[in-house]
Amino acid sequence: MRKSLLAILAVSSLVFSSASFAADLEDNMETLNDNLKVVEKADNAVQVKDALTKMRAAALDAQKATPPKLEGKSPDSPEMKDFRHGFDILVGQIDDALKLANEGKVKEAQAAAEQLKTTRNAYHQKYR
């Protein structure tokens, strides 16, 4: 009995601790916004790459979430598919900017990152 109780406690603590590791949608959006500002103000490729890498991770994590406006919708609904597609676009744009940053092209990476704002604004209009 004691061993099974300990096992249950161990499993439940793992479940709750893993849930706390995953950032919620709002946290991911904040990470994207904060790091976009870093990209805009950066003066070297290392800063740009670091910020874009954080943005990419946040976008991929946010893609798994459901925005409040779509709560109750099926994961296969057209709206949810479009929401996730927006993150596919965003990740592609981040990858394009990251490629430029990896080549040391800071100004070009910053210019490419400007597209992120257009995507953000379009999808915020739909789902925020």
Curated annotation (Swiss-Prot):
It is found in: Periplasm. Its main location: periplasm. SUPFAM superfamilies: Cytochromes. Gene3D superfamilies: Cytochrome c/b562 (1.20.120.10). Keywords: Electron transport, Heme, Iron, Metal-binding, Periplasm, Signal, Transport. GO terms for biological process: electron transport chain. Heme b binds at M29, H124. GO terms for cellular component: periplasmic space. It comes from the Bacteria. Pfam families: Cytochrom_B562 (PF07361). Binds 1 heme b (iron(II)-protoporphyrin IX) group per molecule. InterPro entries: Cyt_b562, Cyt_c/b562. Its cofactor is heme b. One of its GO terms (molecular function) is electron transfer activity. Residues 1-22 form the signal peptide. NCBIfam families: PRK15058.1. Electron-transport protein of unknown function. Belongs to the cytochrome b562 family. Monomer. This is Soluble cytochrome b562. It comes from Escherichia coli O6:H1 (strain CFT073 / ATCC 700928 / UPEC). The lineage of its organism: Bacteria, Pseudomonadati, Pseudomonadota, Gammaproteobacteria, Enterobacterales.
